[in-house]
Amino acid sequence: MKLRFTKMQGAGNDFVVLDATREPLTLSPAQYRYLADRRFGVGADQVLIVGASDEPGIDFTYRIVNADGSEVEQCGNGARCFVRYVREAGLTKKSAIRVRTAGGVIEPRWLVDGRVTVDMGAPVFEPARVPFDAAGLQPRELNGFALWPLDAADRTVEAAVVSMGNPHAVMNVAQFGSGGVDEAPVAELGPLVERHTRFPQRVNAGFLQVLSDTHVKLRVYERGAGETLACGTGACAAVVAGIRLGWLRAGTPVDVDTRGGELTIEWAGRSDAPVWMTGPAESVYVGEIDLPEQGD
């Protein structure tokens, strides 16, 4: 099976983009894993599927499949690449579009400097809606916001729990010592938190270092992908949690340094206010792959 694709990246978070606007595309989890495999396939953190929409007021649909073949609700860096793709492919001339994802509707906008800003929607804090099983837990409250205790191996970590259309557990690395995010135990704790039994749909594990009230560093161990160079929804969740906990300033841009580049996040601090994410999106190359016929 011959399959055309576009390789893209946003702050080092890389994607295989597939165009399903003209005809439906049905691949098995094994085929998605093959595409994302960095040794035998193209290589990517996620596969993005661009689809047509017949829903009034919605320009496109957007699906995200992780490197392990699991489908997820949302991907912020992918959303920026999505906008660049549909413009470069001639699918739209609009600078602002509305896109349906499994996590809800997002509204990306193309900026004159080539960056993309995305209305990622309002954050969700209620544990059941994240989803997060908080039964029997006693959180520590800071600035009126909960830090939940999670048992991970031989220690207990504190995490703020937020959904940005997908679940996030945000941990301040100060609890691990003075080494900062570069020395945080991401490889050790990331997979333990990701698959913690309190998160029925697994969770993205964020490791946050606060540099000032408008500047942070972040590493994220993503569901189904492992640690990536950047995570857009993870950056949104980290800033939202930081604002609610009193570490960061509401209503002003917060710079988020990731291993793949800088993202800018802004949130007014109200529970109904959208989170805005701004950052780069680049096309790397266009190619064609002979995809094995394999089921799962």
Curated annotation (Swiss-Prot):
Protein name (record): Diaminopimelate epimerase
Gene: dapF
Swiss-Prot/TrEMBL keywords: Amino-acid biosynthesis, Cytoplasm, Isomerase, Lysine biosynthesis
Catalysed reactions listed for this entry: (2S,6S)-2,6-diaminopimelate = meso-2,6-diaminopimelate
Highest taxon, organism lineage: Bacteria
GO biological process: lysine biosynthetic process via diaminopimelate
Organism: Methylibium petroleiphilum (strain ATCC BAA-1232 / LMG 22953 / PM1)
Localisation: Cytoplasm
Pathway membership, UniProt: Amino-acid biosynthesis; L-lysine biosynthesis via DAP pathway; DL-2,6-diaminopimelate from LL-2,6-diaminopimelate: step 1/1
Family according to the record: Belongs to the diaminopimelate epimerase family.
EC number: 5.1.1.7
PANTHER family found in the cross-reference section: DIAMINOPIMELATE EPIMERASE, DIAMINOPIMELATE EPIMERASE, CHLOROPLASTIC
Role according to the record: Catalyzes the stereoinversion of LL-2,6-diaminopimelate (L,L-DAP) to meso-diaminopimelate (meso-DAP), a precursor of L-lysine and an essential component of the bacterial peptidoglycan.
Top-tier EC class: isomerase
Site description Could be important to modulate the pK values of the two catalytic cysteine residues, residues in chain: H168, E222
Active site feature: C75 (proton donor), C231 (proton acceptor)
Quaternary data: Homodimer.
Binding positions (substrate): N13, Q46, N66, G76, N77, N166, N204, E222, R223, G232, T233
One GO molecular-function entry: diaminopimelate epimerase activity
Primary localisation category: cytoplasm
GO (cellular component) term, any one: cytosol
